[in-house]
Amino acid sequence: MLLDSLTPPPTEPLSIDEQARAWVERTRDAMSIEEMIGQLFIFSTSQDSAEELGPLLALKPGGINRFPQNDLSAFRSASVHAIEQAVVPPVFTGDIEGGTISYPFATTVPNIMGIAACDDLATTEAIARLVARESRVLGYDWSFGPVVDINHAFRSAIVGTRSFGSRPENVLAQASVYIRALQEEGVAACLKHWPGDGFDDRDQHLVTSVNPLSVDEWYALFGRIYGQLIGQGVMTVMSAHIAFPAYIRAHLPDAGREAFQPATVSHLLNQRLLREELGFKGLIVSDATGMGGLTGWMERSETVPAVIENGCDMFLFSRAPQRDYGFMLDGLRNGRLSEGRLYEAVTRILTLKARLGLHRIDPAERMMPIEAMRDALQTPDHRVAALQAAGQSITLVKDTQSLLPLAPATHRRVVIVAEEGFSFWDGALSRGYGPVLDELRARGFEPRMLDVDQWPTREDTDLVLYLVGQEATPSAAHIFLDLVKLHGSNRKAMSQFAQEIPTALLSFGQPYYLYDAPHMKTCVNAYSAIEPVLRETVRRLTGEAPFTGVSPVDPFCGQEQLRW
């Protein structure tokens, strides 16, 4: 299939003026080889301290990825320290995806699937602009998003709520609006996960996952999505630890294991397919290089230079920065990394920085004063927009028993069976269903947590609510309704309430829990466990507000059994 019929002419996403071009060339030409090597790295921080930053800044990295804790002042101080210590301004990056990984001092917004469930591009744009503006207040220049994977394999724990859904046309429409809004507000967007995830239910944090499509199928789906968004000017793409064997074998028919090479170290996927066929002229960043999909493929000393040599311009994260810096330098000396690729990558890195205006910002002015930051975060307008999106996203999947709306007169005594899920990142928002219980009590309900030693009965319970809240999460392998944990033991996991007591399943995470609970007659998908969503869900359960969410995926997992 020819891509010419699918994609607009590629644009130059990193176009800069002559003054900026001169800065790029002057800065690059003044660098030593060691300084150029440093520019290839984006190191990660999570402690917001000068002590943590010191060894990283000594390597003069091109970027710093921020996973903040909950102290805005410490976060700002660490950013200022990094800026002050740098000769070449570092780019600040982040996984800015919403949901329960929203930053603690920023406005809490639904995750990407929650935004898609609003089924309204104006809402998508409003949330994207809100996120971009607050990200700029926090000093972020580059968001590692949005995810443009197609959520086809419902058992995948890593795509799910991080995606815009399973329908390619919706993914493209939503991502187009989201990227335009981010970049118009001064934040570089990033398409991920190249060459496309969502058809393998495994997680590249643990294994090299596989895009199983034929070449023609890929062109019609991911080729169209990436081609269109590249044509619209997205600045960066994240090359992931995902194999695309059909494309490799189209060029190397006898490929064996090499057909399953991660894109991160694949010249064919990064250079030939992404750059030459799709015409991408922006920056390619690797996915996190500590993930199992890459660490399981080849030895680290070979991996480090191979990532850059095979088409990535920046190397994301390191558990041993000094060691990996040494591996990159050794790779240049022993020929695993060519001078041409080093020169090309550093030029593109500096061009991205110039495109974002970092070359002309006074370091003393890059981070606004702390009080100004506080005033610009969680503004009333932003809170209203986020609350509206939170409510708009909540989706009634089914209510075949006509349980809703709930009322204290009929369902006063409520047993709560809850699993809060976990966060990959220590600084993520705290989890808990306290707001749900508070909202129920305020309306006259009497909620109590399940006592696994005293099973609810018709005589003492009017309603059972299952509250589950695991969003798509790295390294989770699979997300499912864990009845052993919910009910307290393997034996009790076999007991079910749905046919004895009115029961409802409320998901504040993945939208596929019905697969493990086909006999649940009432199901609501709310996509994230942030406080506005928790409170707005109760309003919809009681009929105070309508369910308006439109599921971006098939919550019935293609199984007729789940519909009844």
Segments (PLM) and residue ranges:
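Short, acidic/polar
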Residues: S44-L57, T124-E134, W218-Q228, M298-V304
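Glycine-rich tight-turn/loop motif centered on a GG-T
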Residues: G62-Q69, T108-T123, R155-Q174, D203-A220, ...
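Second-shell residues forming the walls of enzyme active-site clefts
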Residues: A74-Q85, P90, T100-I101, S166-R341
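Hydrophobic faces of well-ordered beta-strands that scaffold small-molecule active sites
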Residues: I37-T45, G62-R66, P90-G98, W142-P146, ...
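Conserved, mostly hydrophobic/aromatic
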Residues: S32, I64, D95, D120, ...
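Preference for extracellular/luminal or secreted protein segments
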Residues: M1-K60, S266, E276, G296-W564
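Active-site-adjacent structural elements in enzyme catalytic domains
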Residues: D71-P89, L121-V137, T347, T351
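Short acidic, glycine-rich surface-loop motifs adjacent to enzyme active sites
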Residues: L6, P55-Q69, S73, F154, ...
